[in-house]
Amino acid sequence: MEGKGIRLPKLGILTLIRHRKVKAGGKLKSVTVCHEKDGKWYCSISFEYPKTELVYPKPSEDMKHIGLDMSATHLYVDSNGELADFEKPYKKLQEKLAREQRKLSYRQKDSKNYEKQHKVVARLHAKIKHQRKDRLHKLSEQLTREYDLISIENLDMSGLKQTLNLGKSYSDNGWGMFVTMLLYKGKRNGCYIIKIDKWFPSSKTCSQCRYVHKDLQLSDRTYVCPVCGNLIDRDEQAAINIDLEGLRVLLSA
């Protein structure tokens, strides 16, 4: 690393647009340069830092905890009833992308105009990808710093997409990538990440009296408990139950 650039073998010093400052005290381990479909070059730099002893908070009922229930329309609903502040770039840019893809279909393949339009489409795809990844990074960092315990469901994403025919929605919200970020950032920030058993009836269990509503259908978006009369949004209730179960699992470990 030299000034605002980086020295690479045979290429010399290349100027970099840095997205964040490099933490002091690290040893440069590797540099990966890649050329993406949008025509831009990206450089991924890895540093090694001395190991520091990570201190997790002592498990207790007083610790700050939250449960997250995955959502197709939003990234998640949490146990406080809040929806993730998550931009869905593919939905937002879908109309523009479709328009540019139609233009591409009218171009003669292998012509200069085709190649030019192909780059426009590629840039849109790259913009969507980078917006989504950036937002996921910010959300996962915020949560793992704010909470001592985050509980989520242990879901089979591939099976869920096929069974419920929700592939596009669930691929767009990036839940799998989000969980991966939570796991490694939880270790880094001293936050417990508990995965609840996928067979745990989070949606069917009343968060007030613990009655299990076995006849609840996927189309029922509001939970009405026939025992205590609890009336609550289905996803919010699932998040509350995930939160309670995660805390129980941690305290009993």
Regions found by a protein language model. Name each.
Residues 24, 37-253:
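Positively charged, helix-rich recognition surfaces that bind polyanionic ligands
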Residues 1-36:
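Acidic carboxylate diad motif detector
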